[in-house]
Amino acid sequence: MLQRSLGVNGRKLAMSARSAKRERKNASTAASKCYVVPPSARGWVHAYSVTATSMLNRRKAILDYLQGAVWVLPTFGVAIGLGSGAVLSMIPVKSGTLIDKLMFQGTPGDARGVLIVVSATMITTIGIVFSLTVLSLQIASSQFSVRLLRTFLRDVPNQVVLAIFACTFAYSTGGLHTVGEHRDGGAFIPKVAVTGSLALAFVSIAALIYFLHHLMHSIQIDTIMDKVRLRTLGLVDQLYPESDTADRQVETPPSPPADAVPLLAPHSGYLQTVDVDDIAELAAASRYTALLVTFVGDYVTAGGLLGWCWRRGTAPGAPGSDFPQRCLRHVHIGFERTLQQDIRFGLRQMVDIALRALSPALNDPYTAIQVVHHLSAVESVLASRALPDDVRRDRAGELLFWLPYPSFATYLHVGCAQIRRYGSREPLVLTALLQLLSAVAQNCVDPSRRVAVQTQIALVVRTAQREFADESDRAMVLGAAARATEVVERPGTLAPPPSTFGQVAAAQAAASTIRSADRDG
């Protein structure tokens, strides 16, 4: 009877444990989808969801660091080379077989010489590759922009080539101690390992040829601009999905209540990323609201204001010190800007290339015009998308977290303002800017965005009237401005492609000059 009672009670306890586990799982699913946490499961769900998501974000941060670390793949290459060399050295090959005829056929001295030559050659090659890599970084920083160094450091083909060379060196060096004599006095030649070293030497030659080919193409300005443009457009698709229309109503952030607690920056640096999901889940579990007032990419000083947090609902009093601290754990501040959540940084990289090209040291206005063409692709996509702030609410509609994003006018200003000022003495650069504004206006749906475009057109016209003493240069820019204004004022008007836009403006300027000369005559 006692055993039967214990068995029944044990089954009941097991059933209740499984039921509680299902309830906790359901509560976690509901919280991750709607950020609504049942009171009975709030503490468990908060601990589980925030911990799991924080681990995911930490993995993302570590992965982003490893992608820009040059030492990671070569280190793996060394480990793989040592391990594979030790394993292949222990593989025996039966004498007289076809495989034996394909293997290395020399003496132990020959095998040792081959391994030494391959190792020494790889050390020299690694030094050359490192020198060429540093040279490419120097060219990128001096000719294009210092903010492009991160793009070069994240170049995977360069890291793979270095890993191949490091693997070959470690493999050949590690195989030297296996060549010698057996304890019984017989000669031992690791034929498989030596043959593998020769094979890796040929692979390294192919990798060196590919590296030179890739390096010569990677430092071309067109390749660099296209890479930055594609990464920026990828971030635009991530933050502003194409499913959102540009005429979607934009919400206005609420004003913090009187008892709101400020969120202060723990140290100085650039606001790199914000874990929106983590903060929303934390706010849902704690019944708080968090509001940031700083854009991602802005520089903040230690103790500077990042945002506000306050208690939601009818619960009186401001949040305790624990919630702001937990909230700030998901706000990442670093010493440099990144392209993880900062579209303006992608625009900044392209603008920096144009500014360096327009500098007196280079004086290359055509490169600046190419940059404007790439900028027009990004700005046109931004003009066609909704640009709402990242707002998270619970199922009842209560605000959980608000992350502000820059407005369309800000993105347009970043892409146009400095190029307009530094290219004020080159009419073709201003004409390219007007073509950009015309293409952007063609994709605008919101009337306020057309106002921003019209403002930039007016600034270009004012610059041309102030800087150009030659009538033909001024007329060329004013003709292009008239065409861009027509596209702004008449939605649906198609802008000419970049290749013909300057020709149309130049023809208009030439006609105006001829008419002026006829009048003077």
Task: Please give the residue ranges for each predicted region.
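Low-complexity, intrinsically disordered or signal/transmembrane-proximal segments
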Residues: 3, 35, 46-48
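Low-acidity, Ser/Thr- and Arg-rich intrinsically disordered low-complexity segments
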Residues: 4-5, 11, 15-34, 40
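Intrinsically disordered, low-complexity regulatory segments in eukaryotic proteins
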Residues: 10-11, 354
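Short, Lys/Arg-rich, polar N-terminal cytosolic tail immediately upstream
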Residues: 44-64
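Short basic (Lys/Arg) and small-residue
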Residues: 54-55, 185, 189, 210-291, ...
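N-terminal intrinsically disordered, cationic/polar leader segments
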Residues: 58-63, 88, 92-94, 102-104, ...
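Membrane-interface segments at loop-to-transmembrane junctions
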Residues: 59-75, 103-120, 145-165, 185-197, ...
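Transmembrane alpha-helix detector for multi-pass membrane proteins
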Residues: 77-96, 106-182, 205, 209-212, ...
